[in-house]
Amino acid sequence: MCEGYATGLSIQAALRSMYSDAAVIVCFSAYNLAHVGRQVKKGFVFADHDEAGIRAAEELPWPWVKSDAPGEDANDLHLRAGLRAVRSVLQSAILGKRGGE
């Protein structure tokens, strides 16, 4: 799950490059991220690296990750550092880490 449409496209591209057919749910806001997340049984969150995004991700019991740069989302990371960087962050979520542990 993520907030923005472009963010979701970057996550989907990274997942496909990892040979995953996982669905990406785009929630369009941090508020919706927490709300929609409570309706879904399991998953992980690629949070925007800002106060609202992190707070929403922490409300859910799932693994969650964020870009290493404050203010960035997955699409910003994709544009700055490439798809490999997005894959690397996603692998942490797949391994069950919360918040880039």
Language model features: what each stretch is:
Residues 5-101:
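TOPRIM fold recognition
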